[in-house]
Amino acid sequence: MLNPPLNQLTAKVNSKYLIATTAAKRARELDERRETALLDQYHSSKPVGKALEEIADGKIEPVVPKEYLG
C-alpha cells in the first residue's frame, strides 16, 4: 500500500508523471545527502517514500520548464 495515498499526492500535483519524476530526483538527493531532510519525522525508511511524504506535505513541488507549459 502506498503511503501517502495516491489521491493525497494528486491533490498536490495533478500529474502522476510529475509525482514520479519529482520523487525520483528528490530520493536521489536524499540518498546522497541525508542532511537535506525537510520533515522532522518520516513514516518511511526509504528515500522514495520520504520524497513522496515531502510532496504530500507540500514541502517540495515539481519544477516544470516554461516551454512545456504551453
UniProtKB/Swiss-Prot annotation:
Alphabetic keyword roster: DNA-directed RNA polymerase, Nucleotidyltransferase, Transcription, Transferase
Gene3D superfamilies: 3.90.940.10
GO cellular component, one term: DNA-directed RNA polymerase complex
GO molecular function terms attached to this record: DNA binding; DNA-directed RNA polymerase activity
SUPFAM superfamilies for this protein: RPB6/omega subunit-like (SSF63562)
Reaction(s) this enzyme catalyzes, per UniProt: RNA(n) + a ribonucleoside 5'-triphosphate = RNA(n+1) + diphosphate
EC numbers for this chain: 2.7.7.6
Biological processes, Gene Ontology terms: DNA-templated transcription
Cited InterPro entries: DNA-dir_RNA_pol_omega (IPR003716), Pol_omega/Rpo6/RPB6 (IPR006110), RPB6/omega-like_sf (IPR036161)
Segments traversing the membrane: none
Classification via Pfam families: RNA_pol_Rpb6
Source species, domain of life: Bacteria
Summary of subunit composition and partner proteins: The RNAP catalytic core consists of 2 alpha, 1 beta, 1 beta' and 1 omega subunit. When a sigma factor is associated with the core the holoenzyme is formed, which can initiate transcription.
Function recorded in the entry: Promotes RNA polymerase assembly. Latches the N- and C-terminal regions of the beta' subunit thereby facilitating its interaction with the beta and alpha subunits.
Family: Belongs to the RNA polymerase subunit omega family.
Name of the protein this chain belongs to: DNA-directed RNA polymerase subunit omega
